[in-house]
C-alpha cells in the first residue's frame, strides 16, 4: 500500500466504486445480448473450400488488427487514418492503466521505461483527438452525421488525455508538475467516464465482438468471407 492524503483516498474509493457500477451495467447488458438466440442461416454452404462459419467469424473478429485486409487502408491516406485509430485507442488503454495503477502501485509509473511509454501513448492520443475535433467540426459531412454525444465524448476525452499527461508528469516529477490535485482530478474525471461510457456511444466496443462474429459467420457460411483477391 502507499500513503495517500484524505483527498486522494476519497478519489480512489470513488474511482473503484465507479468501476463496480460499470461492471454491473456491462454484465447486465451482455446477459441481455446473450439472451437472443443466434439465427441459423438456412442457405446451403456457399464454398466450404474457401471459407466456413468458424473461419469467417474468426477473421471478422480479428480484422481490426489486420489492416492489410481492409479496403480502407489500401491508400496512403487510409492507412494514415488507421494509424491514428491505433494511436488513439492505445492512448485510451494507457490512460485507463494510469488511473488504476496509480491507485495500486504508483511507483510502477515512475519507472522511466513505463512512465515514458505511458506518457508517449497518452500525448499521441491527445494529438489525434485534436485532429478528430478539427475533422468533425470542419468537414460538412462529419457535422451532418454527428450527435451531441459525439461532440461531448470527443471533447471530454481530449481533456482527459491532457489531464492524464499532466498526471503522468506529476508522478514522474517532470515539467514542474508538483500538485497532487492533478491525480485527484484525473481519478474523478476517469470515474465520471466509467459511469458515463455504458450509456453513451463510446460503449460500441461492447457490441464489437457480437456484431463481428455474427457477420463473419453469415458471410463465411456463404463462402464470401474472408475474400480472396484475384
Regions found by a protein language model. Give the residues of each.
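Terminal transmembrane helical module of multi-pass membrane proteins
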Residues: 156-230
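Long, highly hydrophobic alpha-helical transmembrane signal-anchor segments
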Residues: 1-29, 154-171, 175-178
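Membrane-interface amphipathic/juxtamembrane segments adjacent to transmembrane helices
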Residues: 30-72
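Hydrophobic alpha-helical membrane-embedded segments
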Residues: 14-47, 196-198
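Cytosolic juxtamembrane amphipathic/interface segments immediately preceding
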Residues: 2-8, 67-81
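Hydrophobic alpha-helical transmembrane segments of multi-pass integral membrane proteins
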Residues: 18-25, 79-102, 122-132, 153-166, ...
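Membrane-helix boundary/juxtamembrane motif in polytopic membrane proteins
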Residues: 138-160
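Transmembrane alpha-helix entry/boundary detector in multi-pass membrane proteins
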Residues: 78-85, 104-122, 146
